[in-house]
């Protein structure tokens, strides 16, 4: 995939960060979405099924430099036929955005410069904590084994939350 950088004016037109409802309306039915949990060292990746009912952990990308990370995400999207991304947005407990949330927004913005991918943000407050608690209490995984699954499982948690939110919105 070439790195054609759009002009500032055309760049504004290619940015496709949407609300979850608009993401659902603008992506073809029968295509999965990917969910991302952007950590400091890794990117957890999850995928939905084609009905967008169930999210499952998919992969873990070890972060290197942005272009490599972006290409890894886009390769997974292409391989799964995914039409959209749900990116976890780590809000503070009071709902404000701190440095980690700004970093996630920057990732989405920079990804759009490579390819205009429809994406939306999903509040991910406490997702990693909830997943770790589940892995400890329910599955009794050791710290070492948890480290290998927590980020991609958190991505599935984030994506499942978005899918559930869309389903509830469609029923009302």
Segments the model singles out, each with a brief description of its role:
Residues 3-6, 10-36, 41-172:
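Phosphate- and other anionic-substrate recognition elements at nucleic-acid/protein interfaces
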